[in-house]
Amino acid sequence: AALDALENIGLANAPKSGVEIMTGAGAILGEDGRLRFPRALVEDMLALAARDITLYGRDPKYDLELSGTRVYYGTAGAAVHIVDVEKREYRESTAKDLFNAAQLVHHLDNVHFFQRAMVCRDVTDNFLMDINTLYGCCAGTSKHVGTSFSDPSHVAGCFDLIHMMAGGEDKWRARPFVSNSNCFVVPPMKFAEESCITMEACIRAGMPILLLSAGQAGATAPAPLATAIVQAVAECLAGVVYVNAMAPGHPAIFGTWPFVSDLRTGAMSGGSGEQ
């Protein structure tokens, strides 16, 4: 069903660079501006896709081998508020909160990686927020880190910091210890142009990609969960084509992440059982 959706419906709003990359591999750009993906193209890209991926930590003892039946647990999300257990109040999250969370994860044996769990709301400049997010995560733990970038223009400056932490670009490329959590689609079945350009920059810089599709059943995805999953799989398969058309075998993780909407209010139900 997901392959049928890619072949017949396709995805809209790819950036110009993405259109060139994917049509060069065999995707078809329709007169309606949508990219469609023949079944054979998807199968070919899946054959090229990386299999036994290692997510490196700055300390090798925290390396994560993503193969076989191995299962790992970590943080996720981008919370903008936090419950302050000392002051007993609900407030905006800060850079210090992010650092504290990274330190906590570092000392929890059964939490294996740290994705940026909250937004540094006390840093108002977006570039400074991105670079302080990266620094706060890596300062708090030597486990593998996942982060995001709020604008494609911020990627280069953040990589200056990454190369500094790694001891040089060559050492970074040998053991990339940060991955890009990338919501490259805006469901239903549309690319997120700026996120795609960010993803391209991260691929060129050697950073693993977590391909995230976060549709909401009943809002940006069909209400029946089975069809919401079909949509999420189709969107992430489009991401696999995108990544491997650009850099065959580049480490990328299939991140279907369907949520559900509260149909009484229209709000996202982030902690729902459906997720």
Language-model regions: role of each:
Residues 1-96:
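Acidic/polar, glycine-rich intrinsically disordered N-terminal extensions of enzymes
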